[in-house]
Amino acid sequence: MAAAGFYPPRLLPQVLISTGPGFYEDEHHRLWMVAKLETCSHSPYCNKIETCVTVHLWQMTRYPQEPAPYNPMNYNFLPMTWRLASMNTYRGTDAMHWRLLNHSQVGDTVQLILMLE
């Protein structure tokens, strides 16, 4: 049996539009779910003293069939829309910039990791 390998990721989404708390849809109608939301003052992605915010988005092939269990994550500060502003920066509808830290694919899972700048 072959081990799960890393594959070249697909093209970056140009736009991600919120469809509900923790869910976004891109311009190709692909669904993205907030898989992890980190707010901390010490992050492996952040070398600043101030608080860092990173969001991990996973591309899903379809909406979950069952309602999501209670999730303590607060999505209120995430933008309603992200637009790709450059090769490594997304701009939210709130005018905040989010740096692309990672765009990868392992098996069928495509992941984006964004950090608030």
From Swiss-Prot:
GO molecular function: protein serine/threonine kinase activator activity
Disulfide bridge map: none
Xref: InterPro entries: TCL1_MTCP1 (IPR004832), TCL1_MTCP1_sf (IPR036672)
Span of the signal peptide: none
Pfam families in the record: TCL1_MTCP1
Family recorded in the similarity comment: Belongs to the TCL1 family.
Protein name: Protein TCL1B2
Gene expressing this chain: Tcl1b2
